[in-house]
UniProtKB/Swiss-Prot annotation:
GO biological process: translation
Gene3D superfamilies: Ribosomal protein L14 (2.40.150.20)
One Gene Ontology MF term: large ribosomal subunit rRNA binding
Gene label: rplN
Designated name of the protein: Large ribosomal subunit protein uL14
Keyword Plastid part of the UniProt annotation: no
Secretion signal, residue range per the UniProt entry: none
Length: 121
């Protein structure tokens, strides 16, 4: 579960390395899960890239350390909390996605992120 002040790693090549969640988008929501959109601040970034430190960006959560129950009864959990930066059209800002992503992203219509990911779990 991602909430305000949570730090996340960035799973794409947009230039940001670490994010801090500012707000979970939705109607008065406290926690974000895989597939939810958050507003975050860039805390660490690579120089001469598209984003820089202290930029406020939108991102979609692709991995969480919290255990997730699926409708089939399986549970899944990842080693880190990670997000992919998106623009206002819900498309990723980077051209590559690193690490596995959850299958729930396809159900939330983030098919571009799923197609860029090396592994879908």
């Amino acid at each position: 579960m991602i909430q305000q002040e949570t730090f996340l790693t960035v799973a794409d090549n947009s230039g940001a390395k670490r994010l801090q969640c500012i707000r979970v988008l939705g109607s008065n929501r406290r926690y974000a899960h895989v597939g939810d959109v958050i507003v975050a601040s860039v805390k660490d970034a690579m120089p001469n890239m598209g984003v820089k430190k202290s930029d406020v960006v939108k991102a979609v959560v692709v991995r969480t350390r919290a255990t997730m129950r699926r409708e089939t009864g399986n549970s899944i959990r990842f080693d880190d909390n990670a997000a992919v930066l998106i623009n206002d059209d819900q498309n990723p800002r980077g051209t590559r996605v690193f690490g596995p992503v959850a299958r729930e992203l396809r159900e939330r219509n983030f098919t571009k992120i799923v197609s860029l990911a090396p592994e879908v779990i």
